[in-house]
Structures are given as C-alpha cells and as structure tokens.
Amino acid sequence: MIELIEIAPKVLGLKILGKISEEDMHKMIAACEKKMESAERIAVYVEVVEMGGISLNTLVEDLKFVLPNLKRFSKKAVVSSSKWHEPLIKIGDKLFPSIEVRHFTPKQREDALKWVKE
C-alpha cells in the first residue's frame, strides 16, 4: 500500500506500508502528474515502513511512467531501516545520473525532509 504524504509543492511524498498494488501505482502516477503540472522538475520522498513486494505488472506500470519522465525528477530521498536499499541506490546512481538519490535511516527522517525540499 502506498500512502501519499503532503510535503511541499515540488515534492512527491510517499509512504510504503506493505505490498504495492497496481491501484497504488496508478494513484502515485496521478499524484506525480499533478505535481508536474506546476513544476518542471520534482523531488521524491519515499518512507518505507514495510516493504511487502511489488508485482511485475506493477513494476512495468511504474517504469512506463518514470522512464519517459526521468529528466523531470531532481532527487529522491529514501527513508528506511533496511540496508538492502543502499545497493539499489548505487545502481540507480549509475543508470540514472540525472537523479540524485540518498538513503536515510528513520532517525534521519528530518534530515531527509530538509534535503528533499532544497
């Protein structure tokens, strides 16, 4: 489940609370498109409370939106107590150098929010 979080006009805020469904992905894409209506580039804040997985179809939906819009994303903050995100972030840095991605622990949540709004 994805919960939308209001952070700032140019920041898409997401909280992940379990498995991400296609419905969640459509909700996230709609929120992203709305942010992009009023900003050329946006940042993304993702707080992972619990990661319950994502289906291949849902992942494909995400990629179909994200890939053509890569230059519209400036940075991404990932807040998670899990360390498994760090290797993915390093891979993402190599594949998508135009998007700065940083991992933060839950104790660093305020730092993540400050950074993503800069």
Language model feature labels by segment:
Residues 1-118:
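Amphipathic, Lys/Arg-enriched alpha-helical "gate/interface" segment within cytosolic domains
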